[in-house]
């Protein structure tokens, strides 16, 4: 869970800071479908504690580095379209 990478489209530009910076991607990424499967979905960003409370079975670590996103009712998240 911790330190995964995802792409999000922002509604407005951001200023770079200690916590916001460009990320260099590998020049030779893996073949799509071999180890990665891209998904696209319109989802909501949720408060991290909301995710921890809603899904105790996942035993999410107590860290603020995780971006909580999806639909609380289920069915759409990083693994499902």
Swiss-Prot record:
UniProt record, GO biological process: proteolysis
Cellular compartment(s): Secreted
Tissues where the protein occurs: Expressed by the vanom gland.
GO cellular component, one term: extracellular region
Major subcellular site: secreted
Coiled-coil portions: none
InterPro entries the record matches: Peptidase_S1_PA, Peptidase_S1_PA_chymotrypsin, Trypsin_dom
Enzyme Commission identifier(s): 3.4.21.-
A UniProt-annotated Pfam family: Trypsin
A single MF term (Gene Ontology): serine-type endopeptidase activity
Disulphide bonds in the chain: 51-68
Classification via Gene3D superfamilies: Trypsin-like serine proteases
PANTHER family named among the record's database cross-references: KALLIKREIN-1, KALLIKREIN-RELATED
The protein's assembly and partners: Monomer.
Family: Belongs to the peptidase S1 family.
Name of the protein: Thrombin-like enzyme collinein-3
Source organism of this protein record: Crotalus durissus collilineatus (Brazilian rattlesnake)
